[in-house]
Amino acid sequence: MSLYPIYNFSAGPAVLPEAVLETARQEMLDYNGTGFPVMAMSHRSEMFLSILHHAEQDLRQLLKVPDNYKILFLQGGATTQFNMAAMNLAHGFRTADAVVTGNWSRIAYEQMSRLTDTEIRLAAHGGEQFDYLDLPPVETWDVAPDSAFVHFAVNETVNGLQYREVPRLSEGMPPLVCDMSSEILSREFDVADYGLIYAGAQKNIGPAGVTVVIVREDLLERCPNDIPDVFNYRSHINRDGMYNTPSTYAIYMSGLVFRWLQAQGGVKKIEAVNRLKAQTLYETIDGSGGFYINRIRPNARSKMNVVFQTRDEELDRRFVLEAELQGLCLLKGYKSVGGMRASIYNAMPLEGVRALADFMRDFQRRYG
């Protein structure tokens, strides 16, 4: 057993609230006095349908989702949504637009380009413009008014970039399709500004295995009949999310996280905590006199994924190893970027961030 508290800074699957894990432990063999473990419940049983209903209603309340939006709990991860969004929403359109700001939006653009006859246009490219160290302002996006949609990722987990203000387009422009996997529920925004939102659960929602999709009802009219039902949003909605067996336990766990977030005071309260956590780390980096380096333009820095490095790769490796010995785990940066990455999603307590900042200062004292 570690001499230190264990703090999980993984980008995903990520830390879950301790209170949620405790509830899951207590209910592992007997959910709510039913005698059934959730993992062994039929997805069509009244017991599970109640879990699903409450999870959907709690998420709708937390995000203030309007009545004309449908919520789905699907499988396949956010990566599948790169394809599903294009397959469902681009049918009959000559073009759709994509904004590339980092690793995952780049992959989304590439995948969308393969699976539709619609031309996927680059509305903006942060790599070409800023070497992925800044974000192209929304007002500079080259959006075609008659495009099917505009796809973007609001937070880039690999590169440590995040739009300070959640992007929105003026009335009459194509609907926004947004990958919110690594920031959903971390700050307030208006769902009505978007046509479709999707998010893999394993960062801010729950364990891996479920993907949340929030889609405006009128867009479902676009879903073509010549794609497989399992990839058709309308098929899932027409069957109340039961087209195939959903990820029952991941949905149950996500529902527990929604209840936990409500108990914290909701999204507005957790947003203030997240702001303080990010500020703590960036002040440590900026106050290190160059020992720690974050090259992202300050206004584009992510509050969810803080990336940084030291002067050389060997020192970075030493940092990761020594941090883990003190219970600060999974800080190694993404393979294509290197350095370190501290993912500080909703469930990461402020104490964990402060422990990391203390370690960073001590490491600098010893090796600076």
Curated annotation (Swiss-Prot):
The modification N6-(pyridoxal phosphate)lysine is found at residue 203. Pfam families: Aminotran_5 (PF00266). HAMAP family: SerC_aminotrans_5. Its EC number is 2.6.1.52. The keyword Thylakoid does not apply. This is Phosphoserine aminotransferase. It comes from Neisseria meningitidis serogroup C / serotype 2a (strain ATCC 700532 / DSM 15464 / FAM18). L-glutamate binds at residue 44. The keyword Cytoplasm applies. Homodimer. Pyridoxal 5'-phosphate binds at residues 78-79, 104, 157, 179, 202, 244-245. Pathway: Amino-acid biosynthesis; L-serine biosynthesis; L-serine from 3-phospho-D-glycerate: step 2/3; Cofactor biosynthesis; pyridoxine 5'-phosphate biosynthesis; pyridoxine 5'-phosphate from D-erythrose 4-phosphate: step 3/5. It is found in: Cytoplasm. SUPFAM superfamilies: PLP-dependent transferases (SSF53383). Binds 1 pyridoxal phosphate per subunit.
